[in-house]
């Protein structure tokens, strides 16, 4: 495993650990998800260069578009829950009643 692959795997793992362990606020969970998406984007951007192939060049752009949609939807949900509940604490939200 090259050092570049190790750093991207470490960044993804740290983002995943952040999502699983630091779920007190919705904003921190969204930031950890964005970190995971950024590490996936960087990994998918460098993968076709290492293979010297042009067949997978559109995959990072597709992932970038989906992560932008995910960020917009997450921020819209955070604004809606903070307006209705007054906070973005995930412990105070009962998602079955929303």
UniProtKB/Swiss-Prot annotation:
Family the entry assigns: Belongs to the complex I subunit 4L family.
Physiological role: Core subunit of the mitochondrial membrane respiratory chain NADH dehydrogenase (Complex I) which catalyzes electron transfer from NADH through the respiratory chain, using ubiquinone as an electron acceptor. Part of the enzyme membrane arm which is embedded in the lipid bilayer and involved in proton translocation.
Entry's Gene Ontology cellular component terms: mitochondrial membrane; respiratory chain complex I
UniProt-annotated location(s): Mitochondrion membrane
Alphabetical list of Pfam families matching this protein: Oxidored_q2
Membrane topology (UniProt): Multi-pass membrane protein
Presence of the UniProt keyword NAD in the record: yes
The name this protein goes by in its record: NADH-ubiquinone oxidoreductase chain 4L
Gene: MT-ND4L
Reactions the enzyme catalyzes: a ubiquinone + NADH + 5 H(+)(in) = a ubiquinol + NAD(+) + 4 H(+)(out)
